[in-house]
Amino acid sequence: MDDKAFTKDLDQWVEQLNECKQLNENQVRTLCEKAKEILTKESNVQEVRCPVTVCGDVHGQFHDLMELFRIGGKSPDTNYLFMGDYVDRGYYSVETVTLLVALKVRYPERITILRGNHESRQITQVYGFYDECLRKYGNANVWKYFTDLFDYLPLTALVDGQIFCLHGGLSPSIDTLDHIRALDRLQEVPHEGPMCDLLWSDPDDRGGWGISPRGAGYTFGQDISETFNHANGLTLVSRAHQLVMEGYNWCHDRNVVTIFSAPNYCYRCGNQAAIMELDDTLKYSFLQFDPAPRRGEPHVTRRTPDYFL
């Protein structure tokens, strides 16, 4: 298929997905193959230019992603950087991740999608995405196309050399961004080690490194954040991965910010969501938003475990 015809198809797919209508299995396969070609050229520390709007977890809450685009501006008019966790827990993981990947393929320079800890084969089999694919497609092929694609997602991004963005947090195995650039990311998220830590770690009030209650990654204190930022010429670590009630939360004396973009998480947490706009001088402002009005929410009983909020 020539590029022009494919672009036309893509535009039609994006339009369809904007109405929360899933693509068919063959279309998903084609989309994921195209996405791999684009993502394979991206770095483990993907360079991003400002202005850009930085977003946290979305977790299959499709209507809230639509609200995010209403508040922050449509793609490609606004540049976006998403810090992972597109699937699981929400009712529309399929439509959510398909739309974000379609936008990436259509506007590769305008949207950056990083890997979260839920972009993994193992986690999606427990927290909903696998079951949703089975329910919506009658087999696991679409789940396989996406989880194979997840191995290609960049692990981190660097906005204008100063703001370091990633899903989880820092790692005792990593002192410099060059250490991250040297990792082999084309694999399932390991159970331990630097790649695991980047997607699983959390900042903590206690200094130094600590054991994470999540069972993967570490907790890291302000001393660690300050040392890392100073050593790498950074002004800020921007990350997601944790529910914060206001949608964003500063910690470590403003060395770290957490951004969470799924309002009323799991349809029951009552939190606001937020996104962080970085203008062309890297000045930041936060936009908070509440859940989109729900029409005819499917009645799905909670079958996924409560752990790992």
Curated annotation (Swiss-Prot):
Group of enzyme by EC: hydrolase
Free-text cofactor note: Binds 2 manganese ions per subunit.
Cofactor(s) demanded: Mn(2+)
Leucine methyl ester, modified sites: 309
Active-site residues annotated for this sequence: 118
Pfam families named among the record's database cross-references: Metallophos (PF00149)
Membrane-crossing residue ranges in chain numbering: none
Binding site for Mn(2+) 2: 85, 117, 167, 241
InterPro entries linked: Calcineurin-like_PHP_ApaH, Metallo-depent_PP-like, PPA2-like, Ser/Thr-sp_prot-phosphatase
CDD domains: MPP_PP2A_PP4_PP6
Phosphotyrosine: residues carrying this PTM: 307
Alphabetical keyword list: Centromere, Chromosome, Cytoplasm, Cytoskeleton, Hydrolase, Manganese, Metal-binding, Methylation, Nucleus, Phosphoprotein, Protein phosphatase, Ubl conjugation
GO molecular function: metal ion binding; protein serine/threonine phosphatase activity
Main location: cytoplasm
Family, per entry: Belongs to the PPP phosphatase family. PP-1 subfamily.
Role summary: Catalytic subunit of protein phosphatase 2A (PP2A), a serine/threonine phosphatase involved in the regulation of a wide variety of enzymes, signal transduction pathways, and cellular events. PP2A can modulate the activity of phosphorylase B kinase, casein kinase 2, mitogen-stimulated S6 kinase, and MAP-2 kinase. Part of the striatin-interacting phosphatase and kinase (STRIPAK) complexes. STRIPAK complexes have critical roles in protein (de)phosphorylation and are regulators of multiple signaling pathways including Hippo, MAPK, nuclear receptor and cytoskeleton remodeling.
Subunit organization: PP2A consists of a common heterodimeric core enzyme (composed of a 36 kDa catalytic subunit (subunit C) and a 65 kDa constant regulatory subunit (PR65) (subunit A)) that associates with a variety of regulatory subunits. Proteins that associate with the core dimer include three families of regulatory subunits B (the R2/B/PR55/B55, R3/B''/PR72/PR130/PR59 and R5/B'/B56 families), the 48 kDa variable regulatory subunit, viral proteins, and cell signaling molecules. Binds PPME1. May indirectly interact with SGO1, most probably through regulatory B56 subunits.
Name of the protein described by the UniProt record: Serine/threonine-protein phosphatase 2A catalytic subunit beta isoform
